[in-house]
Every structure is written in C-alpha cells, then in structure tokens.
C-alpha cells in the first residue's frame, strides 16, 4: 500500500445521505475476490441516470468524493472500498461514516475524512459553483483545501499513522518479520507449526 500524505484531485459533490454499501456496489458484482476491476460497478444503478454526478464531464475524473452523512452503512464489504479506489477515488469526505466502512477504508488506503456537516455544505457550495475544482487533502495537517476554503477533518491517530506509513494488514505483519522468525525458530518442535507451501 502506498503512503498517503497529501492528495490533490477534482472534488465530486455527492448530495446524498445514507449511502449504503449496496448502493456503492450492488451485490451482483460481488462474485470475485480480486481487488481490481470494479470501477464500472461503482454506483452502477445511479450511473444509469444521465443526470448522476459522475456522468457530468466536470466530475468524471474526480478523486475526492464529498458525500452526505452516514456514508458506507449496510453490510460490510471490502468491494465497496475496492470499487471507489478502482474508479480513482483516494478520499471520501462525510460528516458521519459507518464504523465498518471506515475501518475497511483505512486498511485499503482510502482516506475516510470526517468533517462537520456545516463544512461539508461549504465544500459542496464551492464544488457546485465551480465544477472541476481541485481539492487538496493534507493528512499530516488534517485539513481540506478548496479554492479559498480550508476546513479541518477528523481521523483517529492509529488509522492516520497507518495511512501515512502505507501499512495494510500484511505490511503491519511484515514489520514484525524478524520477531516472528525468531519465535518460530525457538518454538518447541512438538508444537504445531506453519510450514511453507509446497509447489505442485
């Protein structure tokens, strides 16, 4: 996973609340467990509507999604995060996230930045007044910049650290590789052990 420090990209104002994971990616697309190839499934039902925000040329290449409250509710599915990332989003801003979605996002390198709803409204106003406006999200400073507007966002220290370091679950484990190796070498042989996979 790549470290996340700052990101600048086109902001997309999604004026919808209670966006659940089935709206982010419908269940019909969950038949694969690979992490890529889900960009066409993102908001699939809504994108059939010509007036949907991502069908607007100004927002088609957006990478900072500014959504209404209660984003990512519903069932836990990593596919929702994969679809957002595959489309090109690096950041989702909302005043309230479902806990499971927020956790899945941090583990996959997608920043879920919590802003006050009043600040979300200000961001929407900027993005709708000047479609295609770039938004800069600074994880180190915990701020969002758009035009002359700067607003703070919240993220827990642990998730922030993981994103800054670019650590997914495997990366966290590999940081302890030497300790794990030492433990395995000193573990009594009569106890169960994990062996390398055999080819063929």
Swiss-Prot record:
It comes from Saccharopolyspora erythraea (strain ATCC 11635 / DSM 40517 / JCM 4748 / NBRC 13426 / NCIMB 8594 / NRRL 2338). Disulfide bonds: none annotated. GO terms for molecular function: 3-isopropylmalate dehydratase activity. Its EC number is 4.2.1.33. Gene3D superfamilies: Aconitase, domain 4 (3.20.19.10). Heterodimer of LeuC and LeuD. It catalyses: (2R,3S)-3-isopropylmalate = (2S)-2-isopropylmalate. Transmembrane segments: none annotated. Belongs to the LeuD family. LeuD type 1 subfamily. It holds the Pfam family Aconitase_C. Keywords: Amino-acid biosynthesis, Branched-chain amino acid biosynthesis, Leucine biosynthesis, Lyase. Pathway: Amino-acid biosynthesis; L-leucine biosynthesis; L-leucine from 3-methyl-2-oxobutanoate: step 2/4. It comes from the Bacteria. One of its GO terms (biological process) is L-leucine biosynthetic process. InterPro entries: 3-IsopropMal_deHydase_ssu, Aconitase/3IPM_dehydase_swvl, AconitaseA/IPMdHydase_ssu_swvl, IPMI_Swivel, LeuD. One of its GO terms (cellular component) is 3-isopropylmalate dehydratase complex. Catalyzes the isomerization between 2-isopropylmalate and 3-isopropylmalate, via the formation of 2-isopropylmaleate. This is 3-isopropylmalate dehydratase small subunit. The keyword Magnesium does not apply. NCBIfam families: leuD (TIGR00171), PRK01641.1 (NF002458).
């Amino acid at each position: 996973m790549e470290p996340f420090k700052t990101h600048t990209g086109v902001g997309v104002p999604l004026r919808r609340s209670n966006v659940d994971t089935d709206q982010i990616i419908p269940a019909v697309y969950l038949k694969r467990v690979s992490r890529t190839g889900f960009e066409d499934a993102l908001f699939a039902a809504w994108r059939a509507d010509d007036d949907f925000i991502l069908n607007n040329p100004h927002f088609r290449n957006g990478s900072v999604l500014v959504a209404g409250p209660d984003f990512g509710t519903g069932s836990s599915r990593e596919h929702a995060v994969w679809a957002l990332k595959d489309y090109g989003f690096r950041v989702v801003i909302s005043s309230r996230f479902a806990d499971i979605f927020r956790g899945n996002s941090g583990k996959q390198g997608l920043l879920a930045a919590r802003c006050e709803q009043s600040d979300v409204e200000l961001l929407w106003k900027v993005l709708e007044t000047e479609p295609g406006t770039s938004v800069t999200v600074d994880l180190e400073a915990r701020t969002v910049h758009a035009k002359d507007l700067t607003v703070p966002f919240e993220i827990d220290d642990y998730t922030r650290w993981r994103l800054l370091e670019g650590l997914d679950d495997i990366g966290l484990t590999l940081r302890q590789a030497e300790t794990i190796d030492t433990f395995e070498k000193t573990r009594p042989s009569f106890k169960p052990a994990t062996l390398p996979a055999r080819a063929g």
